[in-house]
Amino acid sequence: MSLSESLAKYGITGATNIVHNPSHEELFAAETQASLEGFEKGTVTEMGAVNVMTGVYTGRSPKDKFIVKNEASKEIWWTSDEFKNDNKPVTEEAWAQLKALAGKELSNKPLYVVDLFCGANENTRLKIRFVMEVAWQAHFVTNMFIRPTEEELKGFEPDFVVLNASKAKVENFKELGLNSETAVVFNLAEKMQIILNTWYGGEMKKGMFSMMNFYLPLQGIAAMHCSANTDLEGKNTAIFFGLSGTGKTTLSTDPKRLLIGDDEHGWDDDGVFNFEGGCYAKVINLSKENEPDIWGAIKRNALLENVTVDANGKVDFADKSVTENTRVSYPIFHIKNIVKPVSKAPAAKRVIFLSADAFGVLPPVSILSKEQTKYYFLSGFTAKLAGTERGITEPTPTFSSCFGAAFLTLPPTKYAEVLVKRMEASGAKAYLVNTGWNGTGKRISIKDTRGIIDAILDGSIDTANTATIPYFNFTVPTELKGVDTKILDPRNTYADASEWEVKAKDLAERFQKNFKKFESLGGDLVKAGPQL
């Protein structure tokens, strides 16, 4: 079947030109053309990378995510009053109209068609075809997904198709049961995703992550929102779970270790494997000193999003006037220390949960029991500091099951069950690492956090003397090489330890309230959480 014929199946006709699997050189030329206007236009920065703006949407739009309700989607973890999530149902009738709208938008014009893999394991990867009219969106997926060899592209038949019609608006969204003129919709029967009225690149990346999160656990394979790395021999694999901004990319990109990937992984009988062929790093306040590897990856073929660039092409990473969620996507080979030739490694021995606790309660590292591992995985806690009108900064807690509830398409307990089975089989140990704040009012330094990670990875934490933290019953080391001893017990960072107690009780209550929805899983699990 010719490419035009396959596009016609998706409702796209009359393409005036199809650029199929463009090279980085072709994309650079296309996205920086002087004739481009608005959000299509890329600006070349002095670092060599192109910067683009994504308009109103500088992040994903979870309120606009829908899944077609049909026989193929019966296993989906639908949103409910008890378990609010982003998996909202939409009808087949609405889907037909949205597909026609995307088809109309993408017809009779030049297009980019990019064929890529999601998943480094041949047996379980998805073959994905992306169709879009915007050059830099084709660049984004070329950076972020796994690029097939010429041999693999011969006779490429997609398992999943993504139509990105970011210029089209859903005018009749109310009658279709949608939330706004924007829609990100999946149809599991047709194996297709449609994107309408949002330019944010991450919708394509996280859309396919949601699909891997559906297909893999049903086969007993863990699908995880985590980064992963291994030692220089490729034997001592570690995975880092965490929500956005907790340090997944920063901590897994370590000059002493080989990076497997920075955000999405599977864990099967062969070990841990990356879903992606690139990294999508936050760049707010990025510095060469603190994150040399990420800094070095921002060069020609990297794609910056929503950063401020002056007339001379100079980038201001501290400027968050457009968004705090400034990003860069780059092919994984922009990082020197990576696992080659395929981003996979043996089963993990160390599982690290990253949490940026703005309450200043959690220890910088806790050694978790098996039941605590399940409890804190299902809780998926982090907290942000949100400014209030009078300049007081109040911590806002986030509980996101499995450190990625926004991307789960099956119930959280399924992911926990599969992860724990994999950990038991490999003898992996789990640790909760707080990359947030303590009683000093300052964020725990990257230097101390890196020292903690080193102690986890070299095993020295397992032989350290320990103490127990009240309410949470956490086991914490009392001394670790290269880490300020004072911070290991969070109570020592407060001028008055009773201040920690007040905050600890408050946070413990929040954990208990959040976990009520999992109480049916049994008393042992509930007891593994904070006790007042």
Curated annotation (Swiss-Prot):
<dbReference type="InterPro" id="IPR008210">
    <property type="entry name" value="PEP_carboxykinase_N"/>
</dbReference>
<dbReference type="GO" id="GO:0006094">
    <property type="term" value="P:gluconeogenesis"/>
</dbReference>
<keyword id="KW-0464">Manganese</keyword>
<feature type="binding site">
    <location>
        <position position="327"/>
    </location>
    <ligand>
        <name>ATP</name>
    </ligand>
</feature>
<feature type="binding site">
    <location>
        <begin position="242"/>
        <end position="250"/>
    </location>
    <ligand>
        <name>ATP</name>
    </ligand>
</feature>
<dbReference type="InterPro" id="IPR015994">
    <property type="entry name" value="PEPCK_ATP_CS"/>
</dbReference>
<dbReference type="Pfam" id="PF01293">
    <property type="entry name" value="PEPCK_ATP"/>
</dbReference>
<keyword id="KW-0456">Lyase</keyword>
<dbReference type="GO" id="GO:0005524">
    <property type="term" value="F:ATP binding"/>
</dbReference>
<comment type="function">
    <text>Involved in gluconeogenesis. Catalyzes the conversion of oxaloacetate (OAA) to phosphoenolpyruvate (PEP) through direct phosphoryl transfer between the nucleoside triphosphate and OAA.</text>
</comment>
<feature type="binding site">
    <location>
        <position position="327"/>
    </location>
    <ligand>
        <name>substrate</name>
    </ligand>
</feature>
<feature type="binding site">
    <location>
        <begin position="443"/>
        <end position="444"/>
    </location>
    <ligand>
        <name>ATP</name>
    </ligand>
</feature>
<feature type="binding site">
    <location>
        <position position="206"/>
    </location>
    <ligand>
        <name>substrate</name>
    </ligand>
</feature>
<feature type="binding site">
    <location>
        <position position="225"/>
    </location>
    <ligand>
        <name>Mn(2+)</name>
    </ligand>
</feature>
<comment type="pathway">
    <text>Carbohydrate biosynthesis; gluconeogenesis.</text>
</comment>
<feature type="binding site">
    <location>
        <position position="291"/>
    </location>
    <ligand>
        <name>ATP</name>
    </ligand>
</feature>
<dbReference type="GO" id="GO:0005829">
    <property type="term" value="C:cytosol"/>
</dbReference>
<dbReference type="InterPro" id="IPR013035">
    <property type="entry name" value="PEP_carboxykinase_C"/>
</dbReference>
<feature type="binding site">
    <location>
        <position position="60"/>
    </location>
    <ligand>
        <name>substrate</name>
    </ligand>
</feature>
<comment type="subunit">
    <text>Monomer.</text>
</comment>
<keyword id="KW-0963">Cytoplasm</keyword>
<feature type="binding site">
    <location>
        <position position="225"/>
    </location>
    <ligand>
        <name>ATP</name>
    </ligand>
</feature>
<keyword id="KW-0067">ATP-binding</keyword>
<keyword id="KW-0210">Decarboxylase</keyword>
<feature type="binding site">
    <location>
        <position position="449"/>
    </location>
    <ligand>
        <name>ATP</name>
    </ligand>
</feature>
<dbReference type="GO" id="GO:0046872">
    <property type="term" value="F:metal ion binding"/>
</dbReference>
<keyword id="KW-0547">Nucleotide-binding</keyword>
<feature type="binding site">
    <location>
        <position position="200"/>
    </location>
    <ligand>
        <name>substrate</name>
    </ligand>
</feature>
<dbReference type="GO" id="GO:0004612">
    <property type="term" value="F:phosphoenolpyruvate carboxykinase (ATP) activity"/>
</dbReference>
<feature type="binding site">
    <location>
        <position position="206"/>
    </location>
    <ligand>
        <name>Mn(2+)</name>
    </ligand>
</feature>
<protein>
    <recommendedName>
        <fullName>Phosphoenolpyruvate carboxykinase (ATP)</fullName>
        <ecNumber>4.1.1.49</ecNumber>
    </recommendedName>
</protein>
<feature type="binding site">
    <location>
        <position position="263"/>
    </location>
    <ligand>
        <name>Mn(2+)</name>
    </ligand>
</feature>
<keyword id="KW-0312">Gluconeogenesis</keyword>
<dbReference type="InterPro" id="IPR001272">
    <property type="entry name" value="PEP_carboxykinase_ATP"/>
</dbReference>
<feature type="binding site">
    <location>
        <position position="206"/>
    </location>
    <ligand>
        <name>ATP</name>
    </ligand>
</feature>
<feature type="binding site">
    <location>
        <position position="244"/>
    </location>
    <ligand>
        <name>substrate</name>
    </ligand>
</feature>
<comment type="similarity">
    <text>Belongs to the phosphoenolpyruvate carboxykinase (ATP) family.</text>
</comment>
<keyword id="KW-0479">Metal-binding</keyword>
